[in-house]
Structures are given as C-alpha cells and as structure tokens.
Amino acid sequence: MDIEKMTTTMQEALGSAQQIAQVRHHQVIEVPHLWRIFVQPNSFGANFYKDLGIDLDDYTNLIEKEIDKINSVEGSNITYGQNLSPDLFQIFTEADKIAQKMGDEYLSTEIILLALFELKQNPLTSYLVSHGLTKAKAQAAIEKLRGGDKVTSQNAEETYKALEKYGVDLVAQVKSGKQDPVIGRDEEIRDVIRVLSRKTKNNPVLIGEPGVGKTAIVEGLAQRIVRKDVPENLKDKTIFSLDMGALIAGAKYRGEFEERLKAVLNEVKKSDGQIILFIDELHTIVGAGKTEGSMDAGNLLKPMLARGELHLIGATTLDEYRKYMETDKALERRFQKVLVTEPTVEDTISILRGLKERFEIHHGVTIHDNALVAAATLSNRYITDRFLPDKAIDLVDEASATIRVEMNSLPTELDQANRRLMQLEIEEAALKKERDDASKKRLEIIRGEIAELREENNQLKAQWEAEKKEVGNISEKRNELEHARHELEEAQNEGNLEKAAALRYGKIPEIEKELKAIEEKAKSDDLSLVQESVTEEQITEVVGRMTGIPITKLVEGEREKLLHLPETLHQRVVGQDEAVEAVSDAIIRARAGIQDPNRPLGSFLFLGPTGVGKTELAKALAENLFDSEEHMVRIDMSEYMEKHSVSRLVGAPPGYVGYDEGGQLTEAVRRNPYTIILLDEIEKAHPDVFNILLQVLDDGRLTDSKGVLVDFKNTVLIMTSNVGSQYLLDNVGENGEISEETTENVMSQLRAHFKPEFLNRIDDTILFKPLALEDIKNIIVKMTSQLSHRLEEMDVQLELSEEVKVWIAENAYEPAYGARPLKRYLTKVIENPLAKLIIGGKIPPKSKVIVTLVENKIDFDIQTIAE
C-alpha cells in the first residue's frame, strides 16, 4: 500500500483515523476509525451515503459503538495507530484491485467505500446491506458520479459534482419559490435570449452601473424558463450561477483551481448545451487563480467559448468591464454586450409594487403605496451616489425593518408605566423599614398608587399582546396565501390542471377573503400600541437618517424655530437685516420643499469691511440649523492663492501625491450633503478657483478628481469678500443707509475683480454696512454676557453699569475695523484686571463684581453675596 498513490482527501482521512486511534490508545487503525472520518458532516463520504438513502446519524452511532468495543492498551513503550488492522489492510488491497480495473492512477475515497462490501461479516457492511445498499448499487452510483472519467489527479474528489459544489441552480431556486419576482426588464431579457440563440458569440455579458438589476435579469430568464415562456431552443435548460469565491477558496496546491474549473466546464460540456453558466462579477475570471506558471480562468474559458461548447452569461459594471475585460481583446470579442440602463422613477415604482408582497411577508408589516412612490422619488432626488432600483428597494427594506423592530419592542406607554411602577416599588421597600407616622402615611399612598399602576399596566400589556396577536394573524395568513400561490405556479408548470383549478378557484379566493376580513378588523380596532404600517413618513425618516438631509414633515416646534430664524440670527449678528433675511428665506424655502431641485439651496456673496459679521452670520446659521457651528465646511480661500493649490478643492489628479485622499470641498460635501459652505475671503483666491465654482453655483454639482459626481443641491454657499469695503466705510449715511452711488461703486469694483459668468450665477450679493455706535453698544452687551457666563462657573457674578458700556463703545469704536477692536479693548480694560484680581485672591467664590466708571477710569467694586 503506497500512501503517495492515494488522493489528498484519502491521505487526510487516513491521518485523521490514526489520530483517533492514538487518542483512544488503540494499537492499530481499525475499519471504524477510518469510517468515523468518512461520515463527518459535509464530507465526501457523508454526502455519498446520504444520496444513497442511508441515515447518517444512525450509521454514525453504530460506528461509535464499534470504536468503543476496541480494547485500549496501556504501557510505556507501546506505539499507537502505527499499523493497519488485518480487516482494513484487506479493504485497501481490494480497493487497489478495483482501482486498477477502473484504470485509476490514484486510490480515491469512493473506491475504499466500495471495497468495504468485501468484508461481508463486518457490522458496518451488514448495516448498509440491511438498509438496501448493495455493492452493485454503490458501484452504479460511483459510475454515475464519475461520468466515465478516471482518477488521474490527487484532487479527484474535488471535481465530483463540481457544478453542485461550486454553483447554484437558479431554475431550481425559482421552482422552490426562493426568488423574488422580476418586474419589467422585458427588453433586456429578450436581448439575452436573442444572444443565447445565436450560432456563434452566443455569450451575453450584461453591463451596467451597480444596483441597476443585472443579476435580476438572469433571475428573470430563469423564471421564464420555469414558465416555459422562452423559445424552443431554451426550453428545459438550466442556469447555474458559478461562485468564483468557492472555486478559488481552499485551492492549496498549484493546479488545483484549474482542475476544479475544468471539472465544472466538463460538466457543462457533457450536458450538451442544456446548462447555461452564469458568472456574476465576470471581471473576476481575468486573473482568477493566476499563480506563477499557471493559467487564469479567462484563458481556460476561451477555447470552449470559441468553439461554442459553453453557453455563458456574464454580468459586470461599466468600470470593471473597461478595466479588466477590454484589456483582454481575445476574451472580450467572445462576448456580446447587453447594456443595462438605470430604470426610470416610474419603472422603479412598478418594480417596488411587484416586490411589495414579498417584503410584507418577510417583515410582517403592511406597506402603503405612498411609501413605494416616496421611496422611488426621494431616493432618486437625494441619494445621488447610487442607482435605481437598488437604492429605492433599500429604503423600503430599511423602513420595513424599522417598523418590525418597533413592533417587537415594548411600546413607550407600557415602558413608562413599567419604569414608574419599579420606582414606586423601590420607594415602598425603603418606607417599610421606617417607623414614623409620616412614612407610614406615605406608604399607604404609594401602595394605592402601585395598585392603580399595576391595573393600568396589566390592561396595557393585555392590549399590546392582543394587538400583536392580530398583526401576527395577518402575517400568518399572508404566508399561507404566498404558499398557495407558489403551489398554483408549480401545478401550472407541471400541467396538473385539476390541482391548479382547485387552488385558483377554491383555496386562494378563500384565503384572500379571510385575509381581507382580518385586515378590516385590524383597521376597525385602530391599533394604538402596535404600529405595523410603512408609510411615506417612515421612508422620509430613513432618507433623512441615510443622508443627513431633513426632509421629514415639520413638527410644530420646528415650524416655530424656522419662522423665528431671523430673530434668532439677530441675537448673534447685530445689524445687517438684509443679509439675515436673505439667508433665512433660503433655508425656509428649502424646508418648505419649493426650492429649485437642480441648484444649491442658496448662494450668497457677502461684501463689507472687516469685522461687521460676515463670517459670524455663517457660524450663527450653522449653530441654528445643526446645533453646532462646527457643522459647516469652512474653507479659507487665502490658502488657495497659488494656481496649483486649486486641485486641493477637488482632489489631486492621478499620479500626484494625495490622489487617494479626495478634495477638501468634495469629500466634505459627499460625507455630509446638507451643510453650509463658507468660502472666506474669496477675493484672496487664485482666479482658477472661480472656474471650479461655476458648476456648483449653476447646477449644484461638481466632479472630483476620481470622476465621482458630488451633489451640492442641499448646501448653502456663503462667500465673503472685502472688495469695495473702502467705499462702504467712506460713504455710509448717518443712519447706516448705503447710497445708490456707493452701491454702484462697490459693484463696479466687484465686476472688475470677478468674471461676469461667476457673478451672474450668485443668487444674491449683499452689502454689509459698517457698524454704527448703537450696534457697538449691543455687541458689548453680548460680549459681557459671555464673560458673565464664564465667571458664573467660578461662582462669581459680574455687573457692568450703563455708563461703562457707553464709555467702552466710544473708546473702542473704529469704523474701519468693525467689532474686532472691541474684543481687544474689552480684554484690555475688563478681562485683564479681573484675571489679576482672581489670581491675587481678591475675588473669592460667592462674590459680586460691579464695574463702574470713576473719573473716566474703570473701577471694580467687589461685594460678598449674602447666603
């Protein structure tokens, strides 16, 4: 017996049998040791016996009992499991003879299984024979398994039933009702049928963007084959989806992958055109299994494709087809392209209506038609980096899953009642230990409350259970209806007209009637604790969660917040009414849903001197909309003064450092599509920057360096500039009004600095007025209030007299510099002296500091606050 002349699987089995013998302290390897390895789950031997009708659990128990009967030998110099027992040796001898007779080069597992029948007195043989498995039956099964092939490699077992092992029968899946219906796509399915019917080049490859339904087209073809809705040449054919991952996985030795693939191709070849092979992600065959000195899958397929021995359908994306398939011209020309375009919103709604029932059965929910329409329209508008129908199906699935999770969770009312009950029970336990009258009185009150709450709790729980049961009944009935419809389809395909008639005119209408009655009852009962409907509202919530864009219906609090947005912004930005109104209107338009869907929410150019609130307004808007001023994309345009730095906005071009990192502007918006973009000091940027912004301002789109389209339609663009600020400073009226002449001077300077095509695309150019003395006083109040808040944390109160505020305003006011000198002056005359007093221990906690003006100087009066 030469172990080198055994297949790899057989060698591994013998090694494992030896380990069992060593662990059990058995001197030799017996027949049950080896057979214990053969019947392990999913092994070759287990599948062989299972296919021949042997009860594996029963047979495994017998093998275990036989192993237990073998005597263990103990001792110091004894070697375990080094030799074969006479019975096992006889099996190998017989197997050698059978292998030679069959012309095999290696001894494989199935020959050993066959040789067992030579041990007629062995309990394992007796069991097989008594259960109807004879040597002749086993031999016939082996011949069928091999299909006339001889064992010429050490991986022979890997190549048996290769298609079953490395592929999925799509036609069988359709027959068993495991596939979702395919709606529409008739034209593409007809194209595939036409290509498959050709004499040469009869291998279609479906090319389209990810998520447009390429795989679904092949599933649709499988469904047509089952319904016999195909030409004669395709009737009774089978489509096998090849799993390239399973084919490559575990191929340890050189040539093993090629052997597996050749075995698959041989099975397809032997079927004489009855099997159509489907490879999803077709580009993976280029280079698959390629190691030094071996061929890749693409080269193995070429000869069969050229001779027309293989019917193959492929599916891949446009990018991957270009990258992998078009580089191998010999492989590419053997395929016929079928382009799969993205369906329209109307087609997507039809697809969703076809899938609706499947989702309802899976999740146990009711999906309203308005939810399907919303899923198609909202995904098309807001989820721009993916394709229909995939993204719309995802929304429906996600919304249904959300409702399903809520249905199984405790309702809010019941949860609150439980928490309150627990709280009272804890209080009751604590009061039981007290002996005073007040505690006893309180205990009585609590016990009364607990009794009431328990009653309420039990009622709510009973109501919840009843509602859940009602929803469960609907779900069960839907499942029953689905099963009956599948039975009807099977009966029609098999030509069993009697059964089909009984189902169509008897069972199905009866179930439909029962289902309608249950649904009507649920509607009239008005389920208040269990929400089982998926409506437009749930879809908008999912879209909002996925994109960060608020498109849900406005709740009352949010309406108030939006309507009072100008007043809220004025609390931070003093003066500048026109700017605040313009920005607020853009946001209100967006949330009302009436803005142009093909442009950004708003684009503004803020002009004015330094320190008047241009950047502050953008920050205030971000804080109001997103509760944090960090939630805005701020780009300081002074960093983009050189021509080469422009590429940082959209990403470095291929071949340059930083190509993989993406652009500062495009990446920020891609991650958070609903945002405020602040382009600060825009006049400092290189003129080429404005060329990039033209598409953003006009169409709300920008393509980054990788060719990915970034959507700017849900952003507010704010650009700030100091162009023409000198005119505003010199010529502003006494009441802060800007004259027409000044406006014209500023605009002419603006036109001289920026190109007309850039200025023409901006929604509004807003001139910020220089701050008047009254505005400065308001800003002082705001700044000192911020300082007061900081001091309150140290338990110190701050109070400024009115004359101090006026004095600071008059001394710090510089029209040319706006509010910024005010901050510096406040630090100098208030914050610095205060800091020294605190460090010196002059201002202890629980103090009040009153700031007054004494002889034109700031004076600090420190008082202790009475307890």
Curated annotation (Swiss-Prot):
Subcellular location(s) of the protein: Cytoplasm
Annotated SMART domains: AAA, ClpB_D2-small
Residue ranges annotated for the Clp R domain, each copy included: 3-148
Entry comment, domain topic: The Clp repeat (R) domain probably functions as a substrate-discriminating domain, recruiting aggregated proteins to the ClpB hexamer and/or stabilizing bound proteins. The NBD2 domain is responsible for oligomerization, whereas the NBD1 domain stabilizes the hexamer probably in an ATP-dependent manner. The movement of the coiled-coil domain is essential for ClpB ability to rescue proteins from an aggregated state, probably by pulling apart large aggregated proteins, which are bound between the coiled-coils motifs of adjacent ClpB subunits in the functional hexamer.
Protein name listed in UniProt: Chaperone protein ClpB
Signal peptide (from-to): none
Molecular function in Gene Ontology: ATP binding; ATP hydrolysis activity
